[in-house]
Amino acid sequence: MKKNVISYRRLFLTLIVLLSATVSVFAQYSNKRDFRGAWIQCVNGQFMGMSTKQMQDTLASQLDRLKECGVNAIIFQVRPECDALYVSKYEPWSRFLTGVQGKAPYPFWDPLNWMIDQCHKRGMELHAWINPFRAKTKTTNQLASTHIAIKHPELAFAYDGQMILNPGIPEARDYIVDVVKDIVSRYDVDGLHIDDYFYPYPAPGQTIRDDAEFAKYNNGIKNKNDWRRDNVNVFIKQLYEAIHETKPWVKFGISPFGIYRNKKSDQLIGSKTSGLQNYDDLYADILMWVNNGWVDYCVPQLYWEIGHKAADYETLIKWWNKYAGKRHLYIGEDVIRTVKSPDLVNRSINQMPAKQKLHREMNNVQGTVLWYAKAVTDNVGNYGSMLKNVYWKYPALVPQMKYIDGKAPKKVRKMKFLAFEDGIVLFWKSPKGKDWSNKAVKYVVYKFVKGEKINIDDPSKIVAITSDEFYKIPASAIKPGEKHYYVVTALDRLSNESKPRKKSIRY
């Protein structure tokens, strides 16, 4: 009997501990401001062979599932090799869309425009992702006659089965900037995103043939490596300025390789790693761009596991947190590697909890981008379910970028409830504001029960983030006799949030 009493007591204490841990987890991960992105790539061929309807259905399904998992921003690849998944006067249609470079989709559609519309309907941002310098991947056998490397072969060089637009030629850089300005000016994108491809990744036995360009365009720089870095620096600054001159609210983001420099290369600030380096191998001086404000956000690709011998995840997230905090810092996360790597303390679970904990401990980390979206929607290793039920259980707004604009729009107007045969709908009118900096583009709807403090900093009270000027109350939320308060705020282009306006209803 005594043993049973002790057993029950232990069981009770265990349940209390588990309950406390669960409450602690939800409290810990309830950030109202958090960039929760996912990359949707085409270069892997996942859409090749699909009809227009099949691809749209596939993307719509992915977006629905990603929203359920808490994702609030999509980074969609639209230019993998100087081609286009959108209508372009500069570049041919992508073979990763239609199977043949230069061939338009049939039935005709514009994937970028469609994705912008679909993301905005779901309250998500859409960032157009381009590969700036890569002109041909290894698997592409034929380029269209309208491709830049065919029309102007002098602007590109061959390297390890690829074609690369030469960063050392001003006309090549200008061409990419013109392509970006065309995208930003014609499409309602929330961001323009480039990845880690600048100068090509080093390959054994390969040489970048740019002696002639170095001789012609060195601008007094005597060291070729410094000159190459300067070429990329000039490009990044030029691109940043072009984007913000075209549309000041469009965010410019970069997702570089995860190591800036190893300690052996830079004793002062190098990380305790031994992998390939942005600065030395790709000629990408990420910290210069961040510190000079030439990017709006940086997403280092930390695709390794905690405990990796050459590139330890924990070492690197702490390094980036320390040195790259002058602009928004998000972490590029490899979903599959995370769930396949056992936790170092408890090998019966994967590394997702440990990595999430590290994210929350870093004061400069303001978000995550998941590589890649399909791994989340396929729920590999239960990753998507854990986001939905634990880490991203409640919705989040993307972080503010006060260095672009920090002024919030005015309150919404004329809130009212109307009853229809199929339910009750809350309507409101947008606040007055015509300029991009004060015009409302989205709204946040919160719900509070009678007697509850109105606290819009609590994301668990968010019931919708929408571009509509109405919210239909679900039948499950209507309980006769109960009184609820609905609160609506307005968001501008940069997710600055207005003061709340509330309206009560008794069912």
Tell where the protein language model's regions lie, with residue ranges.
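Active-site neighborhood of glycoside hydrolase catalytic domains
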Residues: 171, 175-179, 185-194, 198-272, ...
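Catalytic domains of carbohydrate-active enzymes, especially glycoside hydrolases
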Residues: 57-84, 186-189, 288, 294
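Aromatic- and acidic-residue-enriched segments that line the glycan-binding/catalytic groove
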Residues: 84-99, 134-160, 196-219, 264-275
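Aromatic-lined carbohydrate-binding/catalytic grooves of carbohydrate-active enzymes
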Residues: 70-106
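Pro/Thr/Ser/Gly-rich low-complexity, intrinsically disordered linker/stalk tracts
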Residues: 382-438, 495-507
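Substrate-binding cleft of secreted/luminal carbohydrate-active enzymes
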Residues: 283-309, 325-403
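Beta-strand-rich modules
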Residues: 475-498
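Active-site-adjacent "subsite" loops/lids of carbohydrate-active enzymes
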Residues: 33, 41, 45-53, 57, ...
